[in-house]
Design a protein with these regions (language model features):
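Gly/Pro-enriched, hydrophobic low-complexity segments
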Residues: 29-57, 84, 97, 222-241, ...
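Solvent-exposed N-terminal domain segments of exported/luminal and surface proteins
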Residues: 29-246, 252
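Long, C-terminal catalytic modules of enzymes
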Residues: 420-446
């Protein structure tokens, strides 16, 4: 069989196993907390028994763990079920995305180790209550901006792709967080560039009286660079409005000035040149340059329960390899995902003709994304490795990986290694008044 036929065979297998999500779309708010989980996932397991029923998530921290400690893998005793690699990828093609198939076939040694499925993700009752309330109040603008709704997932029973994307844009990653993060950018010819910094985040969207506190911005970020030397002291602040494009400012230490960055949106190239601004965090910003639709729902092998990417023994040097991250550190499980496709709108500049997100039913988080170039060829591939943080409670990213399959380069982002601080309930450190240009300048002068 030719490589082209093998590739098309994988795509065909994927398409044939796709289920239309009509039954899910026919549900209503009374099903939340019953046949559906409080955020809209199917509560029941699958017929094969390979996906268990959701039983509330793993809400208890690992014995002995305390806030500020590196993570302990609560599932370290799980035995690997099997591995997917170039020798058997076609056997599993019906439960893989086209991007997963392509990266396995492209890079010798790339594999996916599959473990028993654990539906570990859960949230607070306050988020569940707000999610149910949003079923009668949530409203989007024509651009996909948020006109009403707060405190939980906006559309637990989405009627269209735009609503599904809105669920991710408003996903819970903590009210106040303080993270010491690293990212790497692989270089042509080998090696990587390392960036480190501190990210402070405030999400007024998740305040109990969110719209009274801040009716313009739903999430606010400040990043202060600590490496490399040329970047030390530089600060970037990004504010995400409910109903407008992201707004960003930069602080330049040498000038001691704060300047607004008017173009840091959509497909503006990032520092790494192999990722656009709106690829960050899998996808961010207004979704108004794509037509979005729900393709369906299916079972997919996805990264999950990635606590091993946050243990005290993890080091950049044993995670980052030439073409892809160390496969010994990645855990995959079988989960149900929503497939949401965005097709570029005519009349707008778009780097990608199409983006396909595979969104975890229990969190609305894209765990896998396939991105296509303007000739409709698969070009970039993204993965989001998440884990459950019971102290929040909620599932958050342990690492994001962004692959350019033409350039053979990748970005590893949101890494927190060794004893680096990861505080997901940082109200004692992060304050709501930090997120202004004036406060940003004062922060830079410290």
């Amino acid at each position: 069989m030719s490589k082209r036929n093998m590739w098309m065979g994988g795509v065909t297998a994927f398409a044939l196993t796709l289920s239309y999500a009509g039954s899910a779309l026919a549900a209503d708010a009374s099903d939340l907390g019953n046949s559906l989980t409080p955020v809209g996932a199917e509560r029941a397991g699958n017929a094969d028994g390979t996906i268990p029923a959701w039983n509330g998530g793993d809400m208890t921290p690992t014995a002995g763990w305390k806030k500020g400690d590196p993570r302990v893998d609560p599932y370290a005793g799980d035995q690997k079920l099997f591995s997917i690699d170039a020798s058997n990828v076609d056997q599993y093609a019906d439960k893989l995305s086209p991007g997963q198939i392509k990266i396995i076939k492209r890079y010798a040694g790339y594999r996916m180790d599959v473990y028993p499925t654990r539906r570990s993700c859960g949230y607070s009752q306050a988020i569940y209550d707000a999610t149910k309330a949003n079923t009668s109040r949530a409203k989007l603008s024509d651009r996909g901006g948020i006109l009403d709704g707060f405190g939980g997932f906006l559309f637990p029973i989405p009627e269209n792709g735009l609503q599904a994307i809105a669920n991710y844009r408003t996903g819970f990653n903590g009210l106040y967080t303080h993270l010491k993060v690293s990212s790497t950018i692989s270089q042509t010819g080998g090696g990587f560039l390392l960036n480190t910094g501190i990210i402070d985040t405030y999400a007024p969207y998740y305040e109990l009286n969110a719209r009274e506190i801040d009716n313009r911005y739903m999430t606010k970020f400040i990043y202060k660079a600590t490496a490399p030397a040329a970047s030390v002291g530089g600060i970037i602040m990004t504010l995400q409005p409910y109903n407008d494009s992201n707004e960003s400012w930069g602080y330049i230490p040498g000038l001691r000035r704060v300047k607004k960055a008017p173009t840091a949106n959509y497909d503006t190239p990032g520092q790494d040149d192999i990722r656009t601004f709106d690829q960050t965090y899998m996808y961010n910003g207004l979704p108004d340059r794509y037509d979005w639709k729900i393709i369906g729902k299916k079972e997919l092998y996805v990264p999950y329960n990635a606590s091993r990417l946050r243990t005290e023994n993890l080091d950049i040097s044993n995670l980052i390899q030439d073409k892809f991250p160390n496969r010994d550190l990645a855990r995959y499980e079988l989960h149900r995902v929503w497939i949401v496709e965005g097709t570029a709108k005519a009349g707008w500049r778009n780097t990608f003709s199409k983006r396909v997100f595979f969104m975890d039913e229990d969190t609305w988080t894209p765990l896998v994304a396939d991105l296509y170039d303007t000739k409709d060829q698969l070009w970039r591939f993204q993965e989001n490795h998440t884990f459950m943080a019971p102290e929040m409670p909620g599932c958050v990213s342990a690492a994001d990986f962004y692959h350019d399959l033409n350039a053979d380069r990748y970005v590893a982002d949101n890494l927190i290694v060794k004893s680096a601080d990861a505080n997901y309930s940082a109200g004692d450190v992060v304050k709501s008044d930090m997120f202004t240009p004036d406060a940003m300048r004062r922060y830079g002068l410290r």
